[in-house]
């Protein structure tokens, strides 16, 4: 990566750069010549992050950076990413299905369904709002709540639509427990609710009625 983006770099500079990035992600520089099979899953994830940050990018795209990691290692990796983001003054777009990761890491949130942003705002607005998109509500409903005695979670019914044959109207309507007739034919507009935007006819209706 350094060879590719920094032409003319000397061997000594390359070695120093590799050692610096390893130390930055918590891996001893002495392990720079080891092979992938000699590292744990968490360390491999740290190495990938080190490679991504080696050339000091202004924007880091992190697609499911904690997949297949246990909870303890996941927390360590997220803390490290937050620290490096501040230290290197790098913006980060995190792609994840895990709302716990979102709560720990993100300032702003955009929730997508079938290739479309259906809700966006600050993390605080999304997590604390009294009104959310039905799909967002479904995501929150599928998270275990340790304060309640619930034997089964509440998964979202149905399946994702075929991206080559998206439904008319709201793309979520055939899975939505609050679906209205116009949801089946009319694409919903983005409506501002508090500090965030929701693409939902129900949000539009409630906003017009002054209920939210």
Regions found by a protein language model. Give the residues of each.
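P-loop NTP-binding/switch modules centered on Walker-like glycine-rich loops
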Residues: 2, 61, 65, 69-151
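Interfacial catalytic loop of ABC nucleotide-binding domains
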Residues: 33-35, 151
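Conserved ABC ATPase "signature" region
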Residues: 1, 5, 12-30, 137-141
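Short catalytic/signature loops enriched in Gly
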Residues: 120-212
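A short, proline-enriched helix->beta-strand linker immediately N-terminal to the Walker B motif
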Residues: 54-58
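Conserved ABC ATPase signature
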Residues: 35-39, 43
């Amino acid at each position: 990566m350094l060879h590719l983006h920094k032409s003319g770099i000397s061997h000594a500079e390359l070695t120093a750069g590799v050692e610096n990035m390893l130390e930055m992600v918590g891996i001893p520089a002495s392990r720079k010549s080891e092979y992938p099979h000699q590292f744990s899953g968490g360390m491999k994830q740290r190495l990938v992050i080190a490679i991504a940050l080696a050339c000091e990018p202004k924007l880091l795209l992190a697609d499911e950076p904690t997949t297949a990691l246990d909870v303890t290692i996941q927390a360590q990796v997220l803390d490290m990413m937050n620290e490096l983001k501040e230290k290197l003054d790098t913006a980060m777009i995190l792609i994840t299905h895990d709302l716990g990761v979102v709560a720990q890491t993100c300032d702003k949130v955009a929730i997508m369904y079938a290739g479309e942003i259906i809700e966006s705002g600050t993390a605080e607005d999304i997590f604390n709002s009294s009104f959310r998109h039905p799909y967002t509500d479904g995501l929150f409903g599928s998270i275990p709540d340790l304060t309640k005695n619930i034997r089964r979670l509440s998964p979202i019914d149905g399946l994702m639509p075929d991206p080559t044959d998206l439904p008319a109207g709201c793309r979520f309507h055939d899975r939505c427990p609050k679906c209205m007739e116009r949801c089946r034919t009319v694409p919903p507009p983005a409506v501002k609710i508090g500090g965030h935007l929701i693409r939902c006819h129900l949000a539009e209706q409630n906003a017009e009625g002054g209920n939210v």
